[in-house]
Amino acid sequence: AESGCALWVYEAGSGIRTAISLGELSDGSISLFFGDLSGKVYSINPNTGQKNWAIQGDDHDHARITGTPVYYDNRLYVPLSSLEEVAGAMPDYECCTFRGGLLSVDAQTGETIWKTYTVAEPTKQGKNKLGVQIWAPNGAAIWTAPTLDPETRTIYAVTGDSYSHPAAPESDAVMAFDMDTGDIKW
């Protein structure tokens, strides 16, 4: 660090748009956390650049992590987003089935503690002019880092737009989640 030279480089599987969070784990070690454009979440050793773990935040083909994961008390809170809206602009694409969400992960192991979606499971809503299925509700991705209030055990997150009609009331909204269970408070 004194020389200004890079000590290590980590090659993630996809582009990175999040900032990096740093946290002290329950075993006393330090870890760096970030997400990538393939929807993966990473824990990296800051001294060696070695991967501690990597998980897929969501299994949807268009899932992305664009908001910075937030570390608190050996938990990582990860906002879930997507680029399905871009695919949905194609008239032959069945738009859209991605649902935004928030993921709680054990920062030491990468194991999922809970995952909460911002909208209900999409259902068939009719067809477009080409006869291609349209689904809703969808979207309401969480694009940015959530805000934690440890005193009230609440996580606040802002959601993006719905990808098709009818729009979900949870889209373009501020939502509150229980830090311990992931339950939606409002």
Write out the residue ranges for each language-model feature.
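A generic secondary-structure signal for well-formed alpha-helical elements
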Residues: T48, L80, E84, D106-T109, ...
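Inter-blade boundary loops/turns of WD-repeat beta-propellers
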Residues: A1-E2, L25, P46, A107, ...
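Glycine-rich active-site/cofactor-binding loop and its immediate structural neighborhood
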Residues: A1-L7, G35, S43-I44
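Accessory beta-strand-rich segments of carbohydrate-active enzymes
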Residues: G39-K40, N45, G49-K51
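Aromatic (tryptophan-biased) beta-strands that constitute blades/sheets of beta-rich domains
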Residues: S3-A12, Q50-D59, E111-W135, D183-W186
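Repeat-blade elements of multi-bladed beta-propeller folds
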Residues: G13-V41, R64-E94, R99-L102, Q133-A167, ...
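Beta-propeller blade signature
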Residues: I44-N45, T97-E111, E170-D183
